[in-house]
Amino acid sequence: MENPSASRDNKGFCFPDIPVEEMDGWVKNLISEEDMFSSSSTSELMNFESFASWCNSPSAADILFTQYGLSTSQSIIPFGGLEGSYACEKRPLDCTSVPRSLSHSLDEKMLKALSLFMEFSGEGILAQFWTPIKTGDQYMLSTCDQAYLLDSRLSGYREASRRFTFSAEANQCSYPGLPGRVFISGVPEWTSNVMYYKTAEYLRMKHALDNEVRGSIAIPVLEASGSSCCAVLELVTCREKPNFDVEMNSVCRALQAVNLQTSTIPRRQYLSSNQKEALAEIRDVLRAVCYAHRLPLALAWIPCSYSKGANDELVKVYGKNSKECSLLCIEETSCYVNDMEMEGFVNACLEHYLREGQGIVGKALISNKPSFSSDVKTFDICEYPLVQHARKFGLNAAVATKLRSTFTGDNDYILEFFLPVSMKGSSEQQLLLDSLSGTMQRLCRTLKTVSDAESIDGTEFGSRSVEMTNLPQATVSVGSFHTTFLDTDVNSTRSTFSNISSNKRNEMAGSQGTLQQEISGARRLEKKKSSTEKNVSLNVLQQYFSGSLKDAAKSLGVCPTTLKRICRQHGIMRWPSRKINKVNRSLRKIQTVLDSVQGVEGGLKFDSVTGEFVAVGPFIQEFGTQKSLSSHDEDALARSQGDMDEDVSVEPLEVKSHDGGGVKLEEDVETNHQAGPGSLKKPWTWISKQSGLIYSDDTDIGKRSEEVNKDKEDLCVRRCLSSVALAGDGMNTRIERGNGTVEPNHSISSSMSDSSNSSGAVLLGSSSASLEQNWNQIRTHNNSGESGSSSTLTVKATYREDTVRFKLDPYVVGCSQLYREVAKRFKLQEGAFQLKYLDDEEEWVMLVTDSDLHECFEILNGMRKHTVKFLVRDIPNTAMGSSAGSNGYLGTGT
């Protein structure tokens, strides 16, 4: 008998003609027909007085009336246009209806599941089911007349959702929407904020923004057998969520209670020893590449298939299945995250697989060629199901390549590298890709690329395979990381990613996937480069190391900027002549201090071979600013550097920088001692020590050294100054004279102290009066060379849009005092900012210690300038360490 009060009203979920007690009993009797429901718990959960706070919509009555025969089904008008389904847009209204559900048990299960989920969930959530209905000859997904839970703040969005229908069949509609995609794929899809979708990907975008919708997740609902998807449960929140792990757990528990389930992440099969070896090498390669090129993250994708194990549990089996399309899943243990902020993206990839052809990974799997995208954010979600997460984390360019390992035969591995997010220029991306290819060639031992013939025949690696190892000059092992330079020009190395060219700059933004580079395109790229840049080799550059960079650029016929770029391609981070001048200044400073020591006739000479001070007869030596190293000093310095080189047991890797911040990993070079005129002996000996990357940990390839490498000439300066300070205070210092050895008073014992902190500051006793006097003499000596020069410098510090100007004595003020002066003028907290000065190469250099400050003053002195510019930069709170002191200064105070 039809209930006369079953008509709809617009006053929410209420029944004015039926008492609540009677309605509660009616629901209890209906649900008690199912053995799986407990009548006692159902009475409590289905109490409409408590349920009314969640269901505050006119359609709440439709859920019960329509499903249980209290009213006839009513026609609905589909919501056409862009915001609705395209499949039913032009159909007559009288042909479209929402028929009564064929299975009451499924509706009851969903209603019960929502009741259980209500216990676990919090506020600010809309939960609604989408089920397939037949509209004409097609099946569409609709949430009208389906169970739902509602927070009053999302009532408007619920009403808008009732007017939408989405395609329930593949290839039926170009825009299936979020519920349609999940129903077709059977895989959950979520986003922390719907703003990361495009309007065509989330058809209810306008209504979501109007109702302040943020997070959203759609979950497929499967029958107990798990064979097919019968509905989609959509959860919508009012706040942005980093993930939906808690909600997923609650939904799984609620569905299991009513004999339903959802798709879960399959358990990984046990790996064989060969698979473990291959994955371990992939992990080491990805880690080294990310460190060398400063990549935010790199992922390892493996084709796999699903099979049912014990207790009908899905098991992920690695390897391609010829009977069905392979699914690509990431292997978490082999991925590497260099930027910890990207961990959320890796977690999202763990929850979602890719099919063949999806994203650059799927394209690399089927093409056997590297696949590149200049911006993965421009993908459509159907092309790349993880695009909304890529947009959230701001990922930009990426490249993927398919490899195979000799350990596992024809098993494929897809390595996906994400380029730095700040690198957006096509030329910069191309340079980094070329550099990345060279790095891969040196790192891989058993990994090789796959040719088309191997992919078809399934045979072993043939001659067409691009061998990425088999390089006798470079050896890589898991326990150690020892490399040497290839005896070839870096530019001649064949690039694995050379198929991707920067001559298609206009096509990169719009095209995705594999870009096949033709020979003509490569030639056009070379034409854009100057002929000088192509022909300048390392041997040619070495001939100009003794002069200045500007003179070398003029001789080579290029501008200084181009020459710097050429140097970075060869791993030269700073022009050597500047380093030589720095050594000259250091040695002159040492000799001036030695000459000022009292109590010794003639003076002192520092022997870098023995590390001792030798007294000599009276001598006069002029320290002209344009004098170069004498032959004795050069030999002594070379011997001293050679001694210090013997203490290095692990050879560091050199970092080569390219335009746009790209970094290239290169091996240490051994140059010929019989080099051409003007070349230096072992110029790479000191260049390689400038790198901040030292792979010295046997168990952690690519780990950064805990201590920053110190310049060798700075070490020499520290030893000399420390010894002079001890000699000035009457400490134990042996002085050799022509007729014997004189040993001063041994009453005070001390030892030379070297700095062990990362800043490389000189740790000298501040109570040494003789050292203070020596520095004053140095200042007098330096100032005497310039007529009319002042002993004070003008400081111009800029913080944001403000600039202050003040004077200081460069030989009295230390780094900590300079920081205090700047903090006082800008009213900043000490330790909350950092200073950078503008050097002679127009680059901003960090000012951290007193040695940095002295270096700054020496540069100004060489440039004949009396004004220094400082840039004040804020330091994030997370970067402030307690070991640096309260003011963030890493040096020693006075």
Curated annotation (Swiss-Prot):
InterPro entries: NLP (IPR045012), NLP1-9_GAF (IPR055081), PB1-like (IPR053793), PB1_dom (IPR000270), PB1_NLP (IPR034891), RWP-RK_dom (IPR003035). Transmembrane segments: none annotated. Pfam families: GAF_NLP, PB1, RWP-RK. It comes from Arabidopsis thaliana (Mouse-ear cress). Probable transcription factor. Residues 732-763 are annotated as: Disordered. Keywords: Coiled coil, DNA-binding, Nucleus, Transcription, Transcription regulation. Its main location: nucleus. Residues 792-875 form the PB1 domain. The gene is NLP9. It comes from the Eukaryota. GO terms for molecular function: DNA binding; DNA-binding transcription factor activity. GO terms for cellular component: nucleus. This is Protein NLP9. Disulfide bonds: none annotated. Residues 747-763 have a biased composition (Low complexity).
